[in-house]
């Protein structure tokens, strides 16, 4: 009799994806972040669902409903802070996952990579709309500033912004539709994750050497399930430490002030995970140029497979490319810092230099150094 795990139409899919899946024997902890992202998504959907049971998407009551969740709902405070800080964990895992893909050449699997980029954009859109829902000062002004960027689009910009707002300013209609989309998008993300995994399992996983590992595979369970559980425990420890000891560490104090269209906060800035893109946006004096740079700062990932000039897939044995990769990492951290600073010298010039360096490193230096390494190795 065949094992039900291998014969049942539904269980068979789970078996081939998570149990009997052949995996390279040498993948490191950098390959943990995919499963951590899945867990983050599940956690966000569950906590979000319970929060939605008590939240009201009306400008008059939204702020008070969040206060009510924290004060009156049983364990509402932990749900709210798990959801808010869970988003931060989500983005930490997301950026590390993308960084891993860049370092080890995972972008060679172009379908998986491209679905991943679409996922990144969708998660960013979801997080942005979620930040608007508590209807604090930073929620309101963040929504106003970021949606207003679309007015830079020639001809249709102004109409497009008013269409998104549902009126002539960010108001009740905007909040209601943002709540609707914020609720809907995670389920669309879940479906896209399945497509992401479908394409990944067509080719199999990459590994740190960048060399095909078809002749040395091991079953995913128990080897990588136990490894993923360790990653999960570490992530949960960090998340719970954040939620229980310092839940507002990554938030903005201005968001504890109810939204007031008549009073602009001194420094409008998004959540920390968008600061690098915000710094790139601010570093260009022209509005349309800034918006284009903002979009391209993420969309540039789509052309990375075309810029791969090295004869080796991974950066493991390419010290010059490694130096550039860590320069890029330091550069992104610099941009994140600049995005949170006021628009004054020396922050303006540092932001402009870091933005130029970001695009130069990816578009010119990485392909150039890869070609140079090929010549040095006489390939």
Swiss-Prot record:
Binds 2 heme b groups non-covalently. GO terms for biological process: mitochondrial electron transport, ubiquinol to cytochrome c. It comes from the Eukaryota. GO terms for molecular function: metal ion binding; ubiquinol-cytochrome-c reductase activity. Its main location: mitochondrion. PROSITE patterns: CYTB_CTER (PS51003), CYTB_NTER (PS51002). Gene3D superfamilies: Cytochrome Bc1 Complex, Chain C. Heme b b562 binds at residues 83, 182. The keyword Membrane applies. It is found in: Mitochondrion inner membrane. Heme b b566 binds at residues 97, 196. InterPro entries: Cyt_b/b6_C, Cyt_b/b6_C_sf, Cyt_b/b6_N, Cytb/b6-like_sf, Cytochrome_b, Cytochrome_b_C_euk/bac, Cytochrome_b_N_euk/bac, Di-haem_cyt_TM. It holds the Pfam family Cytochrome_B. One of its GO terms (cellular component) is respiratory chain complex III. It is a multi-pass membrane protein. The chain crosses the membrane at residues 33-53, 77-98, 113-133, 178-198, 226-246, 288-308, 320-340, 347-367. Keywords: Electron transport, Heme, Iron, Membrane, Metal-binding, Mitochondrion, Mitochondrion inner membrane, Respiratory chain, Transmembrane, Transmembrane helix, Transport, Ubiquinone. Component of the ubiquinol-cytochrome c reductase complex (complex III or cytochrome b-c1 complex) that is part of the mitochondrial respiratory chain. The b-c1 complex mediates electron transfer from ubiquinol to cytochrome c. Contributes to the generation of a proton gradient across the mitochondrial membrane that is then used for ATP synthesis. The cytochrome bc1 complex contains 11 subunits: 3 respiratory subunits (MT-CYB, CYC1 and UQCRFS1), 2 core proteins (UQCRC1 and UQCRC2) and 6 low-molecular weight proteins (UQCRH/QCR6, UQCRB/QCR7, UQCRQ/QCR8, UQCR10/QCR9, UQCR11/QCR10 and a cleavage product of UQCRFS1). This cytochrome bc1 complex then forms a dimer. Belongs to the cytochrome b family. Heme 1 (or BL or b562) is low-potential and absorbs at about 562 nm, and heme 2 (or BH or b566) is high-potential and absorbs at about 566 nm. This is Cytochrome b. The gene is MT-CYB.
